[in-house]
Amino acid sequence: PHVELTTHISDATCVKCHNRSGRIGLSYFGHYETEEYGTPFMNGGPSHYNILGNPDRYYLDLPPDVHYAKAHMSCIDCHTMPDTMGLGLHYKNMTQQVGITCKDCHEPHFVQVPPNSLALKLAFLNGKVPLKVGDFAAIEERTGQIIYNVQLIDSKAVFFSKETGKAIPYPFLC
């Protein structure tokens, strides 16, 4: 059978790679890798907190990111399709590799969704986030891409979970 093509990329898929260096994949969910990779002890016995089933890497708990703790946002809720794996260009700073910024959702600018836009296609493929021509959705200021899961409805900003389609009205700001 063929591998399923989906817009529902799981957090587990992201963390398989994004668990080193800045460890954002771990810290977002409230985990911190210990300095001593091979220190599996907790309360005088072996720890069950190993990373991705690797018996040589262990983590400690820390407070999760506010977006995960309060809104249970998934990686794909912020990381849009065009920049899921970066924009494909060379930058001096890795934070420039993705198009979306905090301001795009926390101080959004809304545009009317035009016919045949990528946002309409992505929302259709997603199947959980409602979006139609003429709706108002936020844009990435850096790239001009429409963020289809952040919309203006009845003069209120609404965030939609790409995973569940659940509408979360603002403010859920930090």
Region roles according to the model:
Residues 1-174:
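Primarily the internal scaffold of c-type cytochrome electron-transfer domains
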